[in-house]
Amino acid sequence: MPRKKVTDVSGNGGLKRKRGGGKKKEREFSSDDEFDDYEQENTKKPGKPAAKAGLQPVTVADDVKEKIKLEVPKVKGQLLIFGATNWDLIGRKEVPKQQAAFRNLGQNLWGPHRYGCLSDVQVSCVVSGPCAAHSLIITTEGKLWSWGRNDKGQLGHGDTKRLEAPKLIEGLGEEVIVAAACGRNHTLALTENGTVYTFGENKLGQLGQGNQTDAVLSPATIQYNGQPIVKVACGAEFSMIVDCKGNLYSFGCPEYGQLGHNSDGKFIARAQRIEFDCELIPRRVAIFIEKTKDGQVLPVPNVVARDVACGANHTLVLDSQKRVFSWGFGGYGRLGHAEQKDEMVPRLVKLFDFPGRGATQIYCGYQCSFALSEMGGLFFWGVTNTSRESTMYPKAVQDLCGWKIRSLACGKSSIIVAADDSTISWGPSPTFGELGYGDNKPKSSTTAQEVKTLDGVYSEQVVMGYSHSLVIARQDTEQEKEKLKKLPEYNPRTL
């Protein structure tokens, strides 16, 4: 096994292109308020639902529909949190007027903390996303809890009240939840029998319920009667699901081609305003392609999706042959095709299409991508810091060579990794504690650092929201339990 080393893994390399190299300006950087910029602009309006009148919900006869029972993840442990917890301020210059009462709630936690209210709760899965200021946990019993920002009802409690600490979603109390996903302001939850519930913002059809409304405050099922679903993922304002047969479906905002239907959905409405023809119910992604060196486009047959991951405006899919496809916004090289062109349908990432070079895990950050190869190597492409050069195609992260990575997550610009007995993180300034280095320690790092505050803590799973980190810490032995007890307890102030 190669010698372990943790040095510079900033991912710079490959064909490098600097920011501003002729690529159109990406909307996600057009406003300091990155959560609400589409509300401030007139360029992102949903089109008329009538435009989708011909699309019928996916339906499979009951006699051919598979019967499945998905399992809650086998992991169990205690939840740890660090990073920004003023949920209404994350990604914004100031707290919105309607949330003014919460202005001084929440703080930056510079090191790992235990939630006091969860001292007796065994957590099997934790969920957030690079666009999200809300989070979810799934307990060992398959119950879903949520907390954080709730402007659009993305917590699923039937209201828009922000929550400082995890609370059981009573509307899903009768269900066993096995997986979930967080978008910017919406949430997907997957049950053990393959049913998908959605809640939160639905202005762009991202809930897949067949309509466009400002918000859905309580869990409701998507308009879909096909084969049971086994995977769910969320981009900023769109959603992806995979059924048990390996078919991929998408719904929500089609901007940049991120839905994979060979269109960005733009059309000119009245007063020369650009609007989007949103997908309001799950629609199958039917075409997968590869491009040859001479520019020829060839279809890729027999794609059976096994996993899906979403960034703010791009998507990765891992198929049964360990191939990786990417599409959506092409800025900063996040698609891995050595060019900054948007892709309207899933395109094969060439590096992983060789014997012994296939991928086993995929991850998306806000504007970057990672894949773990079957040989155990970690590959990176895209950018975490837009002031630095982009990595335009997958490049091995040599400085994590030799680490056995089991979990990885990306926030807006920070990264956290669980590998062997260590937790590793890095990210450029500004950071808000999501790197977990502790009080009176460096706040940011452009090179990977072991998180010393978690020495002796075995991280089963790591997850990042926009600027906060969540860890499931194993507590199987008395030694592990004692180590966790020494961590500070977080009991947030509430109104």
Swiss-Prot record:
UniProt keyword annotation of Cell division present: yes
Positions of region (Disordered): 1-56
Superkingdom assignment: Eukaryota
Any matching Pfam family: WD40_RLD
Topology in membrane: Peripheral membrane protein
Any GO CC annotation of this UniProt entry: membrane
Compartment list: Nucleus, Nucleolus; Nucleus; Cytoplasm, Cytoskeleton; Chromosome, Centromere
Protein name: Protein RCC2 homolog
Amino acid composition bias (Acidic residues), ranges on this chain: 31-40
Keywords, comma-separated and alphabetical: Cell cycle, Cell division, Cell membrane, Centromere, Chromosome, Cytoplasm, Cytoskeleton, Membrane, Mitosis, Nucleus, Repeat
Gene Ontology BP terms: cell division; chromosome passenger complex localization to kinetochore; neural crest cell migration; positive regulation of attachment of spindle microtubules to kinetochore
Region (Required for interaction with RAC1): 291-298
Gene Ontology MF terms in the entry: small GTPase binding
Record's function text: Multifunctional protein that may affect its functions by regulating the activity of small GTPases, such as RAC1 and RALA. Required for normal progress through the cell cycle, both during interphase and during mitosis. Required for normal attachment of kinetochores to mitotic spindles. Required for normal organization of the microtubule cytoskeleton in interphase cells. Interferes with the activation of RAC1 by guanine nucleotide exchange factors.
SUBUNIT field: Interacts with RAC1. Interacts with CORO1C.
InterPro entries: RCC1/BLIP-II, RCC2, Reg_chr_condens
Gene disruption: observed consequences: Morpholino knockdown in single-cell embryos does not lead to gross anatomical defects, but causes subtle defects in the migration of neural crest cells, so that cells populate also the pharyngeal pouch, instead of being restricted to pharyngeal arches.
Repeat region (RCC1), residues: 76-138, 141-192, 194-244, 246-320, 321-374, 376-420, 421-474
